[in-house]
Amino acid sequence: TPFGLFAPAMEYMVDAAQRSVLFWDVMRQRGNQYREHLAKTVPHVLDYKAELVVDGRTLERPVNYLLVRVTPPAGVEINPKLRPFVIVDPRAGHGPGIGGFKADSEIGVAMKAGHPCYFVGFLPDPVPEQTIEDIARAEAIFIEKVTAAHPQASGKPCVIGNCQAGWAIMMLAALRPELFGPIIVAGSPLSYWAGVHGKYPMRYSGGLLGGSWLTALAGDLGHGKFDGAWLVQNFENQNPANTLWTKQYNLYSKIDTEAPRYLGFEKWWGGHVNLNAEEIQFIVDELFIGNNLAAGRIHTSDGTTLDLRNIRSPIVVFCSKGDNVTPPQQALDWVLDLYENVDDIRACGQTIVYTIHESIGHLGIFVSGGVAKKEHGEFSSNIDLIDTLPPGLYEAIFENKTGDTANPDLAGGNWVMRCEARTLDDIRALGGNDLADERRFATAARVSEINLSLYRTFMQPMVRALVNAPVADWMRQIHPLRLQYEVFSDQNPAMASVAALAEQVRENRKSPASDNPLVAMQEKFSDQIVAALDGWRQASETLSERMFLAIYGSPTLQAAVGVDPDATQRLRKAPKNPLHRELLQKRIAELKSRIPTGGLRAAIIRGLIYAGMNRAAVDERGFEMARRIREAHGDMPIADFKALVREQFYILLIDQEAALAAIPSMLPPDKETREKGYDLIKQVLGARGELSADDNKRMSEVARLFGLEGGGTRTHLREVPKKPQAKAS
């Protein structure tokens, strides 16, 4: 009937009018929140109380960075013997705090696991003339302070670097490797040219804009400061459907419940910060366009070369196929730039663990509660396992704990983590650049250098003469991203009546029926808008890629800027170090001399490594069993245990036959002690379930070496004390 059609329409119109009022009231709240947030001395979005430890502005080379100690919330107990965690937030246009944005965050899961937590944040404006190197030196002081504050800790601090902070931490670890425990880099680009055709076009933007001269121009227009709002806008441009429609529509369609989450995120997203012009110029020239980090082409002010092969701490790389800002290739291809094979990685004493999420976006890597509880939670709980892994390349795999999981009490949480051995071919299989692509990006880098020189010679003096501090400040205030907050705040008289009207709407709120046909039509209309914007994005990305490949693939242009069009080698390959080879040979000779030494403890570790060699994976249950055994037999410090595991691994790698032959001479004469040692190996190896035929074969060989042809006795898992857990509410 006509009335039957009219009723849903009226219901929908009333709801739409009410939603519109509530939507604009949230926009008003967002604008007010933006102004209040920026008025603070240290604006941040940390969900925790914290106490200042070091103010970077007081250092010899002052910077705008701060180190704070995070206060654990009620109900969370910190174990002083556990290594501290240091979370470093990205300074990429937004303010600090996203690493501790909520309870299910990197900080939250680390404290829940019992670790003391520190946070490295920053102020909105840089100290005049501060550089990237100054920040690195300040962060070194921060880590020294953290280490000194925890003399009882089982290991050096675990440092987490999100996005931009990841490559900054890697640079510092290359300069000061002795400071670090395990390093976790989340969504951090380290190989800036890497990618595959048809995806991730952000890497082409530097070449299509003619290089970094625009960066220099932006710094000059800011009177020596670079407005971080431009970086935020660059992020938003990667997903126009979300920027122009989905984010706002999601709020509108869920207006009765979505406002707190929306405002919480917008508080961080709109907290724009500035960088010095010199800082952003370094980042663009040396990293994003030059791709010089992994190639070892960056030098400090005193001439020291930044070589990522100097890093001695385990490196955990967390990336995602759904991340269009830092795709897996940009997060991992630095390994290909540095090494020829896994033996090269081992020769440098490096342990590299990576995990690739199938779908999460860039921000989700360090914002998503689900990711925090799963990946970051497992990393926090198993950080000592990662720290003890023998050198090599591994992929972290997470399996859901079920009723069929063997020895579930040995794995904390809802997941079981194992680290599976990988080769460089596994990284190559993700796809990447060929030599033609390498030449294109090298050409773009040379064009950038030329254009930057031209700008500095002919335009920069004029721009600097025209722009003073008040003009630069005015231009920052009228940036479109800032205006969208300012315009819809209470500063705008037109918004004065919105709050009162919204209160009336809440008192008389009427939602439509769930089966209202117009609501379903609205959803379909929204889907069509998203599809249209996604189509526009895909078309523009395809055009961008084709333009870049055509322009910088020109042999004429390549030759003109000094790039050999017929080059047959990668243009950003890190050089070999002859001194490293010499030191390696000395280390091998030293290890060979230690083959018959170490006694019972070394023999047990050697036998365990040999017995599990063919598994190509290390399971957290096996490590937890080893930890319980270690505590039950004198609690060998984790640093000593790590050194022993690495030494025995290298000894087996160098000369397995001699290493095994030496085991009988390392054991005591009494059979009972040898049986106990053998049973410890069997417990650790059996922690993940039944032994395979190969496991049993190797265990028989170990039994023979231990003088136990019958295979030793059986010690039950329950006889070993369980790991003490930190309490959490």
Identify the role of each PLM range.
Residues Q130-A148:
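Alpha/beta-hydrolase active-site loop
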Residues V159-G161, A186, F318:
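Short beta-strand immediately N-terminal to the catalytic nucleophile in serine-hydrolase-like folds
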